[in-house]
Structures are given as structure tokens and as C-alpha cells.
């Protein structure tokens, strides 16, 4: 069950003034039962750009599959080597129908344009909690994906950790102003939490990491509870730039 923050994270997002740029995901979306997140390794910035263009062509020239996705967002890694895919579906059955009837043709066209793509690590998630300040109209220049692993799949432990993060954010006396939003997802197929965090820029996120304390967040008791939460085994941080968004009945939007 998705928990919305008191700010109703997506209801406050104003219409975009610049339709040439990708639309951020609508995280709290009616009917979205599962989120798929995966990466492709492409190797170079030039191949990143070519792959994004190939994805846009492959999807634009075909009818949208009846079962979805509800939305599909592609990001380029800031190190120039990978793509991140974030898609929303009504459920696993809708995704399986897409794989059975529509995925291979699209992938074949993309692979013909950019040979040698390595498709890695597609996982299923459910959105648990989102946070965005009411009326904050800033657009993300950088998406920070934080993957947090636990020593077991217990969903209650993972929810408790996310709740602790929200308490720490809400009480932080020196939160970096460059953070825009945070959207926490629980893996349905393993012991992981994924935070899709929107920031003004990569520089803003780096400044937050370099501030006093251990990572993003001040040296408070609440953040200490987050960092020492029972069952944590490790985490990984990657930075991405929004590149392409596709949705039902919506023209693609590209950088």
C-alpha cells in the first residue's frame, strides 16, 4: 500500500512550461501496481544518446500496448555509460503481457541501432512513501538513485527504516536546499529499498554529501538511527539525468 506524504507529493507539481524536456514520473499514480527499474550498459556518452533516440523511435512508431506501461522514463548516467529505466504498470500480469507480445520487436529495433547493449538488473518495486513540498515547482537537473540492501526481505523492517528517514528529514536543522523530492520504493522480489530522489543539480547533491556528517543529512540523533538501523547491509548511490519520458496518450518528451 502506497503511503503519500502530507505534502501530496505529485498533486503540488505545477504544469511544465517547457514541453521539450522530459516529464518527471507521476509517482502517486492511480492504477499503478508495480514499478519496474532496470539498467542498460551502453559504454559511452555517444552510445547513450544513440540508444535514447532509438528507444524514442521504437516506441513512437508502434501503437502503445493495451496493458501498458502507464509511464516509461529513461535516464542517462552521469558517468556516460548506462541508461536507467523507470516504468509504471498496473501489475505483473500487464508487464508479462508486454514481454509476450510487444517487447521483442522494440528491443530488436533498438539493438540494430546500438548493437551490444547489456541489459542488467530489472527489478520490481512498489512505491511506499513520497515527499515533496507543496508548491515546489523546481525541475530536477539530477536524479539520485539510492539502493539500500537489508539482510532479509522483511517488509516491516524496510518500512520502519523509510519511516525513520522521513523523521530525520523532517527534523534536520540544516537540510540542503538543493533536494527537491524523495520517493521510496520497496522491492517485491528481494530485500531492497530504492530511493528515487530529485535534486536541482549534481553539484547540489555533491555539496550535501560533503557537508559535515556522514552522507546526506546532519549529525542528528534521528539520522544516526537511520544509519545504524537493524538489518542494513549496504547501499549504493548513482546519479542520472532525465532523458526521455513516454506515457499513455502523451507524446514523447526529450532533452
Go through the PLM ranges and name each one:
Residues 1-83, 90-255:
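Short S/T/G/P-rich N-terminal loop/turn motif that feeds into the first structured element of a domain
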Amino acid at each position: 500500500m502506497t503511503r503519500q506524504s502530507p505534502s501530496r507529493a505529485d498533486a503540488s507539481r505545477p504544469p511544465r512550461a517547457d514541453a521539450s524536456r522530459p516529464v518527471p514520473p507521476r509517482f502517486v499514480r492511480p492504477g499503478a501496481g508495480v514499478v519496474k527499474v532496470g539498467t542498460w550498459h551502453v559504454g559511452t556518452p555517444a552510445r547513450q544518446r544513440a540508444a535514447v533516440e532509438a528507444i524514442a523511435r521504437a516506441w513512437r512508431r508502434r501503437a502503445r500496448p493495451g496493458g501498458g506501461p502507464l509511464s516509461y522514463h529513461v535516464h542517462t548516467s552521469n558517468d556516460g555509460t548506462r541508461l536507467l529505466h523507470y516504468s509504471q504498470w498496473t501489475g505483473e500480469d500487464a508487464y508479462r503481457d508486454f514481454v509476450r507480445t510487444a517487447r521483442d520487436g522494440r528491443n530488436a529495433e533498438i539493438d540494430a541501432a546500438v548493437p551490444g547493449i547489456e541489459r542488467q538488473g530489472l527489478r520490481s518495486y512498489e512505491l511506499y512513501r513520497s515527499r515533496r513540498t507543496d508548491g515546489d515547482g523546481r525541475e530536477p537537473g539530477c536524479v539520485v538513485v539510492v539502493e539500500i540492501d537489508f539482510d532479509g526481505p522483511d517488509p516491516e523492517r524496510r518500512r520502519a527504516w523509510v519511516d525513520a528517514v522521513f523523521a530525520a528529514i523532517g527534523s534536520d536543522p540544516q537540510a540542503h536546499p538543493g533536494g527537491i523530492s524523495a520517493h521510496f520504493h520497496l522491492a517485491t522480489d528481494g530485500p531492497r529499498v530504492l530511493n528515487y530522489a530529485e535534486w536541482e543539480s549534481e553539484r547540489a547533491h555533491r555539496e550535501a554529501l560533503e557537508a559535515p556528517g556522514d552522507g546526506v543529512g546532519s549529525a542528528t540523533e534521528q539520522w544516526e538511527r537511520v544509519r545504524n538501523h537493524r538489518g542494513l547491509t549496504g547501499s549504493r548511490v548513482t546519479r542520472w539525468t532525465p532523458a526521455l519520458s513516454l506515457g499513455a496518450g502523451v507524446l514523447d518528451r526529450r532533452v
